[in-house]
C-alpha cells in the first residue's frame, strides 16, 4: 500500500476502536467514499418505509427487530482526516486526537460455534421437504461460521483496501456503529440505485465457479430456474406499483472467483419520496429469501437455526436529491474483537442436492476468507 493508504488504515482502525459511526465504501469503477457522524448518534429505524426522504448511509438487517434495527449514519464529515494528530469533533463540543486514544473493544458475545456440515445437512433436510411438497417454490438456506482471530494486529481497513483491489466488480464496504459493530463485505447485488427519476435493480441468482478465470457459458436448468424466480418477483413488484421496467436477458457476471446470472431492470420512479415503499416491496428478494415471500420469510426465521443479523439485509448510500446506491449485504463478515463471523447462503429448489449446496456456501465464504488469511 502507499503511504497515504497506510495512514488511512491507521485512522480508520482507530475510529473502530473509538466506537465511531462511519462508513467507507467503493462502488465498482469509482473511488472509495467516506462518511462519518460525529454529532449525536446514528438514527435507529424500525420500518423500511421510514427511509423515505432520509439521507445518509443505511445498514438494514434481514429482519428488523429491537436487536437489529435499521441504522442510518447521518454524516457531518465526508473526508477522512489524514493529518497526524488531527482533532475530530465529538458530541458535546469535545474533541479527541486520533492517535492518542486507548483501545476499547466492542463488547460482543462470540458465538460458541459456527454451523458445521452436519447441522447444515439437518437444516437442508427441513428446507427441502416443503419444497418437494410444493408448499414453497424456492427457499434460501444460509449459515454462519465463526473463525477465531489468529492475530491481534488484524486491520479491517487494510482488509478493505485488499478487497477493493481483489474484487473490482463488487461493491466493497467497511462500516462501524455502536449498534451494529464492524462489518466488511464485497457484494455483487444491487437492490436499488439511481437518481432523478431513473432507477435500476437486478435479479441476480444462480452460482458457478469461474472456468479457468473466465465466465462459464453453460448453465444448468436449476441455476436458470433459480434466477428466473428472482426476475419474476421483481417484475411483479414493479408492476404492482404501475412501473413498466426495461429488462435485459440473463447473462453471467463475475463476483470474485464465482459467477452468477443477472438480469438488469431499468425504470422511472417519478415520486422519489416513495423509495421506502419500493424497498419494502423488494426486500427481501427471492435471492436471499424465497417464494412466496411472506411465507418463506417466516419459515426461514423459524427454521434456519440462527440469526442472520445484517447479513442479507441491504446497505449503502441514500440522498433524497442525489444518487442512491443500495446493495444486498452478501459475501460479508461481522468483525468482532477476537473472531470473525462469516455468512453465506444459497437458493434451494426441489431438485437441489445437499452436497452441492454445501459446497456453494463454502465457495462463497472464500470471498471473506481470502481477506482473513492474508494476515
PLM region spans:
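Conserved hydrophobic/aromatic pocket- or pore-lining residues that grip, position, or stack substrates
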Residues: 134, 192, 232
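Intrinsically disordered, low-complexity linker/loop segments enriched in Gly/Pro
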Residues: 88-181, 187, 204-208
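Contiguous alpha-helical scaffold segments within structured protein domains
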Residues: 82-118, 124, 148, 202-302, ...
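Short, conserved loop-to-beta-strand elements that form functional interface hotspots
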Residues: 59, 171-176, 314-315
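Conserved hydrophobic core element of enzyme catalytic domains
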Residues: 269-375
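An N-terminal, globular interaction/scaffold subdomain
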Residues: 18-88
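An anion-binding catalytic pocket shared by soluble metabolic enzymes
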Residues: 19-32, 36, 150-229, 322-345
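Intrinsically disordered, low-complexity segments enriched in serine and arginine
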Residues: 8-12
Amino acid at each position: 500500500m502507499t503511504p497515504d493508504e497506510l495512514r488511512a488504515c491507521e485512522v480508520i482502525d482507530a475510529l473502530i476502536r473509538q466506537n465511531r459511526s462511519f462508513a467507507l465504501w467503493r462502488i465498482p469503477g469509482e473511488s472509495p467514499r467516506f462518511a462519518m457522524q460525529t454529532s449525536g448518534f446514528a438514527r435507529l429505524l424500525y420500518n423500511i418505509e421510514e427511509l423515505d426522504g432520509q439521507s445518509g448511509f443505511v445498514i438494514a438487517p434481514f429482519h428488523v427487530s429491537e436487536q437489529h434495527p435499521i441504522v442510518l449514519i447521518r454524516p457531518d464529515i465526508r473526508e477522512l482526516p489524514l493529518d497526524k494528530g488531527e482533532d475530530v469533533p465529538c458530541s458535546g463540543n469535545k474533541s479527541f486526537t486520533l492517535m492518542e486514544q486507548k483501545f476499547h473493544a466492542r463488547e460482543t458475545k462470540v458465538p460458541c460455534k459456527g454451523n458445521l456440515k452436519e447441522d447444515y445437512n439437518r437444516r437442508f433436510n427441513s428446507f427441502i421437504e416443503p419444497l418437494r411438497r410444493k408448499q414453497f417454490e424456492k427457499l434460501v438456506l444460509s449459515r454462519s461460521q465463526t473463525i477465531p482471530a489468529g492475530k491481534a494486529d488484524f486491520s479491517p481497513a487494510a482488509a478493505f483496501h485488499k478487497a477493493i483491489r481483489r474484487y473490482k466488480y463488487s461493491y466493497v464496504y467497511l462500516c462501524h456503529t455502536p449498534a451494529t459493530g464492524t462489518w466488511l463485505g464485497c457484494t455483487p447485488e444491487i437492490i436499488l440505485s439511481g437518481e432523478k427519476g431513473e432507477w435500476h435493480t437486478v435479479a441476480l441468482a444462480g452460482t458457478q465457479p469461474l472456468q479457468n478465470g473466465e465466465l462459464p457459458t453453460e448453465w444448468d436448468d436449476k441455476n436458470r430456474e433459480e434466477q428466473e424466480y428472482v426476475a419474476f418477483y421483481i417484475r411483479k413488484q414493479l408492476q404492482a406499483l404501475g412501473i413498466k421496467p426495461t429488462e435485459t436477458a440473463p447473462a453471467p457476471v463475475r463476483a470474485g472467483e464465482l459467477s452468477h446470472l443477472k438480469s438488469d431492470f431499468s425504470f422511472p420512479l417519478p415520486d422519489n419520496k416513495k423509495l421506502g415503499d419500493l424497498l419494502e416491496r423488494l426486500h427481501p428478494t427471492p435471492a436471499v429469501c424465497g417464494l412466496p415471500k411472506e411465507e418463506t420469510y417466516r419459515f426461514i426465521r423459524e427454521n434456519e437455526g440462527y440469526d442472520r443479523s445484517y447479513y442479507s439485509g441491504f446497505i449503502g448510500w441514500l440522498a433524497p436529491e442525489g444518487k442512491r446506491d443500495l446493495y444486498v449485504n452478501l459475501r460479508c463478515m461481522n468483525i468482532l474483537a477476537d473472531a470473525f463471523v462469516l455468512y453465506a447462503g444459497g437458493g434451494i429448489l426441489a431438485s437441489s442436492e445437499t452436497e452441492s449446496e454445501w459446497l456453494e456456501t463454502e465457495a462463497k465464504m472464500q470471498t471473506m476468507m481470502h481477506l482473513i488469511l492474508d494476515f
